[in-house]
Amino acid sequence: MFLNKKYPSLIEKKMDDLMTLKFCYLIITFLIITNIFSLAINIWGGGDMIDRQSCENIFYCPKDWVGYNNACYYFSNNNKNYTDANNYCKNSHNSTLANNDTKLLNLTKLLNLSKLYYNDSTYWVKYSLPKNKAVTLRNSTYKYDRVKYTETFFICSN
């Protein structure tokens, strides 16, 4: 029963292990050489073969700001009156209250964006009016002198 089975001798087994080891060394050497070659090509001028993305279209917003349509917006989560909100925006990343003069995004879209990120609350935004004029919002008239006392959320943009 055991006589027909062939067991490799110790010398044959070492020979197989040695061949396996040499083969592993050969593969590792090949991989190291190809990595060094690729690195050398990238460092010394062969970088034209790699397609690089243009950085012109990339913009970064400060932490806790939302990037949208090439502009950054900060949606407050605390209430301030208009004057304090405007000052906060000026002191925060050199920004302003979001306003109706923005060329990148109209105010309606901005307020719809605020619903997406936060809630249906009201926000201070800067809307240019001639002096001593009032604006009608939701069937209510607010004059500029009242804004110092009304506290609500606000949106900064830069």
From Swiss-Prot:
Residues 61-157 are annotated as: Lectin-like. Keywords: Disulfide bond, Early protein, Glycoprotein, Host endoplasmic reticulum, Host membrane, Host-virus interaction, Lectin, Membrane, Modulation of host cell apoptosis by virus, Signal-anchor, Transmembrane, Transmembrane helix. Residues 48-158 are extracellular. Residues 1-26 are cytoplasmic. GO terms for cellular component: host cell endoplasmic reticulum membrane; membrane. Glycans are attached at N81, N94, N100, N106, N112, N119, N139. Induction: Expressed in the early phase of the viral replicative cycle. Expressed in the late phase of the viral replicative cycle. It is found in: Host endoplasmic reticulum membrane. It is a single-pass type II membrane protein. It comes from the Viruses. GO terms for molecular function: carbohydrate binding. Disulfide bonds join C61-C72. GO terms for biological process: symbiont-mediated perturbation of host apoptosis. Homodimer. This is Lectin-like protein EP153R.
